[in-house]
Swiss-Prot record:
PROSITE patterns: PCI. Keywords: Coiled coil, Cytoplasm, Initiation factor, Protein biosynthesis, RNA-binding. Belongs to the eIF-3 subunit A family. This is Eukaryotic translation initiation factor 3 subunit A. Residues 1002-1019 have a biased composition (Polar residues). Residues 621-641, 800-1038 are annotated as: Disordered. One of its GO terms (cellular component) is eukaryotic translation initiation factor 3 complex, eIF3m. Residues 92-121, 611-899 form a coiled coil. Residues 621-632, 800-901 have a biased composition (Basic and acidic residues). RNA-binding component of the eukaryotic translation initiation factor 3 (eIF-3) complex, which is involved in protein synthesis of a specialized repertoire of mRNAs and, together with other initiation factors, stimulates binding of mRNA and methionyl-tRNAi to the 40S ribosome. The eIF-3 complex specifically targets and initiates translation of a subset of mRNAs involved in cell proliferation. InterPro entries: EIF3A, eIF3a_PCI_TPR-like, PCI_dom. It comes from Aspergillus oryzae (strain ATCC 42149 / RIB 40).
Length: 1038
């Protein structure tokens, strides 16, 4: 069954509009809230649900129902974030716009109420929007009867301001840590900052900063969730940086310096996570705000360092723009006036750094060095510096960059007076016009007080070097400043006491005699003598103080140093060898340094190469790790998406099952109600008031109905039986009494029936006569129309017959035409089929002929290939025969050489060498004797065989070959000669006992041929196989 009509969003929207039209806005909001938060809404289409949400947020704003709006918007985000993100942004923007509109209307209403008053800052006296009504305000409202502007704003504007603040916070909570909604999140955060700035909401700004900070912290904690933001993404990180910079600007505008410093820390944390460098315009804003924060916190050292970093950034941006490597959007626009101003502030802030620490603290005896070190490390990291700044380093950096030339004249003169040419007696006269110029500038006026501290420090340092005691009046006269910046004696004494408490000054004040006494103890610590070296000082360089002359304490303290120097010079004059040894050692060290410079340079280059390789390997490993991480993250994201899809499918199935079950329960309940109503209306006496409908079912109702019917039937039978007994007696009495009156009643009945019959008969006859007369008259009246009717019927019949004949002939013509057409189609079809069949047979025949022709061509090609192979084989046979003849000649020459060697061994004379005639017969392959060299008869027979014609080949069987050797060298021309003949032992059964030449080991029989035996021709020589055969294969073939 389809769902109930009220479940559809269109019906809910229509119902809510109807309720709004009759003035029932809360009821309409409840209807919309129930529909939005219902589980059935998840399956509704977003297109139809968006108008419902727009009306829902509008009612929530009108009725100031922030909690209901939060619940509905959370539910709507969960429904639409996987399908359509734009609709979430539309609804949330509408929500914020309506809340802002209500605040504007409330302000206009308050202005109308208090038109005579002007307000520069609405609701400025309300410190906390979440704690508006305090006991004081309630008492004031009770006692006071006048209507002030503050009370009007508190009653009219402040509730809507509170609702607008709740709106921003709700929207930020809904959009947090969602990568698909982070643009809307940033926009809402910027709007919330503007809200705090416009209405001067400092408390809400602190809560907003903490809320955003918690969101960023939770982003790393819940990074594995679906649609979680990734701070490694440059675009996401840039959006958060933009938000934090706006937060920093608003904090500075509201003068919330603690929140501004925490914003600085947030920005520094995000910058450390960023892979791309920040824009120069953003960093310029960063250093400018940081300098203002340090100035407010009276940390003049890091304030000057921030100004130095700011100036370096401006100079870098100017150089980048001049080189055309950057854009004006990414780099701050810098003019000569801006550069001069920045340089002046760099020098002025460096001059304002206290030489000694004069702030109120527990003194140098407390162990606070570790805390100060950690604090300085944090501030140094915020400035992006490698080491903590110092006063001397800042001045050195400024002088190296030539900032004095670009600074304003009064700042340049102030530097010369304080750091170059400081004279305690004329310092105040020289510096008075400069302080007046600085005090006239509102931005530089803040540096007058720290400059006074520096001047006093320099003054007492110089006085301590010249005087042992001075009068207080003299000191007061020296420390005279211009009129707006005068220093009272109390302030001077306070300065002295703080310096002495820190251990940076060693001064005693005698108010009775009015004298200032400087500590002249010879054995006093060097800390009191060298201001700025203490733990609480802002400066640790002793040389920064101008030394006019040494004090007695310094003379006593440096006595050993002077004595050591004097003795060293005396030794150099008394013992020249000592000086020469020092010079030789120095020269040897220089020689060693020069000799090892090249090697050290090579080692440095090699180390640099190794470092580069390690860097490349580390970079590759990092990139590989990043790729693997991205792959794992992508796989994890896919798994999460699949899990989310599976979860949504499971939820949808569960919702469908629940819907079907609810529908079945609803139908069953309706059926039960219907059956109960039928049971109540159909069966009397049944009571269902105490029966629970949840426990009922159809079977139980049927059983109850049957039981009640059985009960009613039994009661009816009892009543019938009782009534029957009673009626039997009455009926018997009634019938006995009737028997007396039946005859008279029968006669009266017959009489009444006869009278009634006669009346009905007369009436029937009269009606029949009247109808007959009317029919006769009608017949006479219509008889005149009979000829006309017959003619008309005849005409109609003839026309219809003609029409029938015409249609029948047309049908016959159509039938004949269609019959001919059908015959023609059949003939064409048969003709076409015959042609197709003949074409198929022709194609088949052509295909068979083509296959046959291809087979013939293939056979011809195969025959040609075989012929070519045969020719090539014949050529190879001829070449192999030639090679065999060459081998035989070589073999003959080897045998002759062997025979000559054998003859030399046995003592026979070597036959004379003669030119061999050209042989026409093949060389004989005669095996030598086994007992020794060839005999004379054998050599003569060989000569005759070589000189005569080749005899006929022998017809007898070849002799058995000697057993083949399993090892040793085998000539190439004999490796395949005897492969076909099996090995056999010698005919006489004895192994040869004499040396057998290699050429005759495997050829012929073991016994020498007979002197009368005809040698074999070359045709009987074993033919070479034409290719090399391995020895193991030869042995296997044997």
């Amino acid at each position: 069954m389809p769902p109930p009509p009220h479940i559809k969003p269109e019906n809910v929207l229509k119902r809510a509009q109807e309720l709004i039209a009759v003035g029932q806005a809360p009821a309409a909001l409840n209807v919309l809230h129930e529909h939005v938060t219902s589980k059935r809404t998840r399956s509704s289409p977003i297109v139809s649900l968006e108008p419902v949400m727009l009306l829902f947020v509008e009612l929530c704003v009108d009725l100031r129902k922030g909690k209901a709006a939060k619940d509905g918007l959370y539910q709507y985000k969960n429904i639409a974030q996987n399908t359509n993100v734009a609709t979430i942004e539309v609804v949330l923007k509408k929500f914020i716009e309506l809340a802002e509109k209500k605040v504007t209307e409330a302000q206009a209403k308050a202005d109308e109420i208090q038109s005579s008053l002007e307000s520069a800052a609405p609701s400025s006296n309300v410190e906390d929007l979440e704690a508006i009504e305090t006991p004081e305000t309630i008492l004031l409202a009770t006692v006071s009867g006048e209507q002030s502007r503050d009370r009007t704003d508190r009653a009219v504007v402040t509730p809507w301001l509170k609702f607008l603040w709740e709106t921003y916070r709700t929207v930020l909570e809904i959009l947090k840590n969602n990568a698909r909604l982070e643009v809307m999140y940033q926009t809402t955060a910027l709007q919330a900052f503007q809200f705090c700035l416009k209405y001067t909401r400092k408390t809400e700004f602190r809560r907003l900063c903490e809320l955003l900070r918690n969101h960023v912290q939770n982003a790393a904690k819940y990074s594995a969730q679906m649609h979680a933001i990734n701070l490694s993404d440059p675009d996401t990180l840039q959006r958060h940086l933009d938000t934090r910079f706006q937060q920093l600007n608003v904090a500075v505008e509201l003068e919330l310096w603690q929140e501004a410093f925490r914003s600085i820390e947030d920005i520094h944390t995000l910058l450390s996570l960023s892979k791309r460098p920040a824009k120069n315009v953003m960093m310029a804003n960063y250093y400018e705000k940081l300098a203002r924060i340090f100035l407010v916190s009276e940390n003049y050292l890091f304030h000057a360092a921030a100004w130095s970093r700011y100036y370096n950034l401006l100079r870098q941006s100017a150089a980048t723009l001049a080189a055309g490597q950057g854009t004006k959007k990414e780099n701050p626009s810098v003019t000569d006036a801006d550069m001069t101003k920045a340089v002046s502030f760099v020098l002025l802030s460096a001059l304002a750094i206290p030489v000694i620490s004069t702030s109120r603290s527990r003194g140098a005896l407390v162990d606070v060095d570790e805390v100060r070190k950690n604090k300085n490390t944090r501030l140094t990291n915020l400035l992006g510096m490698a080491q903590s700044p110092t006063r001397a380093v800042l001045f050195k950096d400024a002088l190296n960059k030539g900032l004095l030339k670009r600074a304003r004249p009064e700042i340049r003169d102030l530097y010369n007076i304080l750091e170059v040419d400081f004279h305690p007696l004329s310092i105040c006269k020289k510096i008075t016009p400069i302080l007046k110029q600085i005090g006239a500038d509102p931005e530089m006026e803040k540096y007058v007080v720290p400059l006074q501290q520096v001047i006093l420090t320099r003054l007492f340092q110089q006085l301590s070097q010249v005087y042992e005691s001075v009068s207080l009046k003299f000191v007061y006269e020296l420390a005279q400043f211009p009129d707006p910046f005068q220093v009272t004696p109390a302030m001077i004494e306070k300065f002295i006491m703080n310096g002495c408490k820190k251990g940076d000054l060693a001064i005693r004040v005698d108010h009775i005699s009015g004298v200032l006494t400087f500590d002249t103890d010879v054995f006093s610590s060097a800390k009191a003598l060298h201001s700025g070296s203490a733990a609480g000082s802002a400066e640790s360089e002793v040389g920064s103080v101008q030394r006019m002359q040494n004090t007695p304490a310094e003379i006593a303290r440096l006595q050993l140093t002077r004595l050591a120097k004097t003795l060293h010079v005396s030794c150099m004059y008394v013992d020249p060898s000592y000086h020469e040894a020092r010079l030789q050692a120095k020269q040897a060290a220089q020689t060693r340094a020069a000799a090892g410079a090249a090697k050290e340079h090579e080692e440095t280059l090699a180390r640099r190469v190794i470092i580069d390789k390690k860097k490349e390997a580390a970079t590759d490993a990092l990139q590989r790790k990043q790729r693997e991480e991205e792959t794992r993250k992508r796989i994890r994201t896919q798994q999460l998406q699949e899990a989310e899809k599976q979860r949504l499918l499971d939820e949808q199935r569960e919702r469908e099952k629940k819907r079907i079950k609810d529908e079945q329960d609803r139908i069953r309940e309706q059926e039960l109600k219907k059956q109960i109503e039928e049971l109540k209306s159909g069966v009397k006496g049944i009571d269902l008031s105490e029966v629970d409908l949840k426990d009922l079912d159809a079977n139980r109702l049927r059983a109850m109905k049957l039981a009640q019917l059985e009960k009613e039937k039994n009661e009816l039978n009892d009543r019938i039986r009782t009534t029957g007994k009673r009626i039997d007696h009455l009926e018997r009495a009634f019938r006995r009494e009737e028997l007396k009156h039946i005859p008279a009643d029968y006669e009266a009945q017959k009489k009444r029936d006869m009278e009634l019959y006669e009346a009905l008969k007369a009436e029937t006859l009269k009606e029949a006569e009247d109808k007959h007369k009317e029919a006769v008259a009608l017949k006479h009246r219509l008889s005149r129309l009979v000829p006309v009717f017959n003619n008309f019927r005849k005409e109609v019949s003839e026309k219809r017959h003609e029409e029938f004949e015409r249609r029948r002939k047309a049908a016959e013509r159509d039938f004949e035409a269609k019959k001919k057409q059908r015959i023609k189609e059949v003939q064409d079809r048969r003709r076409r089929e015959r042609a197709e069949r003949e074409e198929a047979e022709r194609r088949q025949k052509e295909e068979e002929e083509r296959i046959k022709r291809e087979e013939e061509e293939r056979a011809a090609k195969e025959e040609e290939r075989r012929r070519v192979l045969a020719e090539e084989k014949a050529k190879r046979e001829e070449e192999r025969k030639k090679l065999d003849e060459i081998a035989l000649k070589q073999k003959q020459r080897e045998e002759e050489a062997e025979a000559r060697r054998a003859s030399r061994k046995t003592g026979f004379p070597e036959p004379p060498a003669r030119a061999e005639p050209e042989r026409t017969a093949p060389r004989l392959n005669l095996a030598p004797r086994t007992g020794g060299g060839p005999s004379w008869r054998e050599r003569q027979a060989a000569k005759e065989a070589a000189g005569g014609a080749a005899p006929e080949p022998a017809k007898e069987e070849p002799a058995a070959q000697p057993p083949r050797r399993t090892g040793g060298y085998v000539p190439p021309h004999l490796r395949g000669a005897s492969a076909a003949a099996p090995a056999a032992p010698p005919s006489n059964g004895a192994a040869p006992s004499r040396y057998v030449p290699p050429s005759a080991r495997d050829s012929g029989s073991s016994t020498p041929p007979s002197r009368t035996q005809t040698p074999a021709t070359t045709s009987e020589e074993p033919k070479s196989a034409g290719k090399w055969v391995p020895r193991w294969k030869q042995q296997q073939g044997q």
